[in-house]
A protein has these predicted regions:
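Divalent metal-coordination and catalytic microenvironments
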Residues: 9, 37, 42, 65, ...
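Active-site-adjacent C-terminal substructures of enzyme catalytic domains
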Residues: 242, 252-369, 381-388, 394, ...
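Conserved beta-strand scaffold positions in the cores of enzyme catalytic domains, especially
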Residues: 5, 11, 58-62, 175, ...
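N-terminal metal-binding scaffold of metallo-dependent hydrolase/deaminase domains
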Residues: 1-53
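Short peripheral tails and domain-boundary helices/loops at the edges of structured domains
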Residues: 397-412
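Metal-coordinating catalytic core of metallo-dependent amide/deamination hydrolases
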Residues: 111-126, 132, 140-254
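Metal-associated gating/positioning segment near the N- to mid-region
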Residues: 63-126
Length: 412
């Protein structure tokens, strides 16, 4: 395969071979100014100062002074859904809470009702449009959850759509089974029967078709208890599905501790945690993942990411792209929110959506930084001075080109 040279790069960001960055290391700044990168066989083969760039390379992309960064790694999304929920948005503007809307049949149950009426082909078509949109904004790896089916067949339908996206997209995709997203209306008076369905029917069928990498549970006030979460995750583990958890979004639910107990790859949300949860995370290998776009959209507290990093934790940041609480998969916007509302530095935010986001999907050995042998998922910006400027001047598209698996995907 012909090699590709990216030349005249103003600054290369994210140069390192680490697989996860914690605490003060999240401020690490591996930069080359006036550099080049060579891609061969869809992977980064070399990089360095421009005056050391090889000659006579077959394909040449001129960065024209722009920045080059690893493509974003978004480790928490729900992009397979049937319909938007802007009606609930206007209800919240009038004073209704997320919990009140959910209790009245809105929220997740609203999405489930619409998804159950939508064909697999239509779900694939709409999810493909969303995936293409976020790839164009620089996302090259993504985790996608089920959870709007809430019946065995509809959960399987969602996961088959995710598998089809994986087969037809240049993005690296991880799939998560989230049957324990909410208790369906038909089981409101017998929640144990639904949990039995998850354990005895859904999980075996999901695993039998090889449709998921992970099993997630919404462990929070009004959804699933810690005891229920523990049972579900233990059952999933027997079938080879690793744990992830929605935890501590609405209350101090105990979800962090139950995630750690079940060796969760990540615990996500964390808007309502304190010293106890932070200390527990420090003693574990579970990755805390924060979702600033959700806090912004629901107007709820932001996770204490600053305190977490200052305590020595590494964090991932993800969009939580979904129709109800975060209808955006735009990572550049997320980065501005994280800096402004969580008081993170641009470098910390950058590592949260690159190497640490990759780690939360167990792919940081091949993605999330710029280093020889890693997959060439890259963003080339327009001619701007720095990463700081990229985040500071929010609302403007600073991206010029997106390269996924070594191929030019999108040019502005």
């Amino acid at each position: 395969m012909t090699a590709t040279l990216i030349k005249n790069i103003g600054k290369i960001y994210g140069i390192h071979d680490k697989q996860f960055l914690k605490g003060s290391a999240m401020s690490f700044s591996g930069i080359i100014e006036n550099g080049y990168i060579v891609i061969e066989n869809d992977k980064i083969s070399s990089f360095g100062p421009m005056d050391q760039a090889p000659e006579n390379v077959g394909n040449v992309i001129d960065a024209d002074g722009g920045l080059v960064m690893p493509a974003w790694c978004d480790s928490h999304t729900h992009i397979v859904y049937a319909a938007s929920r802007e009606g609930e948005y206007t209800l919240r503007l009038k004073g209704a809470t997320y919990e009140e809307i959910a209790a009245n049949g809105g929220g997740i149950l609203n999405s489930a009702k619409k998804l159950q009426q939508t064909s697999e082909d239509d779900l694939f078509e709409s999810a493909s449009l969303r995936l293409n949109e976020i790839m164009a904004s620089g996302t090259g790896a993504i985790e996608i959850k089920s959870g709007y089916g809430l019946t065995t067949e509809d959960e399987l339908k969602m996961l088959r759509v995710i598998r089809k996206l994986k087969e037809n997209s240049p993005a690296v995709i991880k799939a998560t089974f989230l049957g324990a997203h909410a208790i369906p209306a038909a089981y409101q008076d017998n929640r144990n029967k639904y949990i039995d369905l998850i354990i005895n029917e859904m999980i075996p069928k999901v695993a039998g078709e090889g449709l998921a990498d992970y099993c997630d549970v919404f462990c929070d006030k009004g959804f699933f208890t810690t005891a229920e979460t523990d049972i579900i995750l233990k059952s999933a583990s027997k079938y080879g599905l690793k744990a992830k958890i929605h935890a501590n979004e609405l209350a101090n639910s105990g979800g962090v501790q139950i995630g750690i107990k079940n060796k969760a790859i990540s615990v996500d949300h964390l808007e309502r945690i304190g010293d106890e949860e932070i200390n527990a995370l420090l003693s574990s290998n579970t990755i805390p993942t924060v979702l600033p776009s959700c806090s912004f959209f629901l107007n709820i507290p932001f996770a204490p990411a600053r305190m977490m990093i200052d305590s020595g934790l590494g964090i991932a940041l993800a969009t939580d792209f979904n129709p109800g609480s975060s209808p955006s998969g735009n990572i550049p916007l997320l980065m501005a929110l994280a800096c402004n509302h969580m008081r993170l530095t641009p470098q910390e935010t950058f590592h949260g959506v690159t190497i640490n986001g990759a780690a939360a999907m167990e792919i940081s050995h091949s993605l999330g930084s710029i280093f020889p042998g890693k997959i060439a998922n890259l963003i080339i910006t327009k001619k701007i001075p720095s990463l700081d400027y990229f985040i500071y001047a929010f609302g403007t598209n600073h991206i010029s080109k997106v390269i996924l698996k070594g191929k030019l995907l999108h040019t502005y």
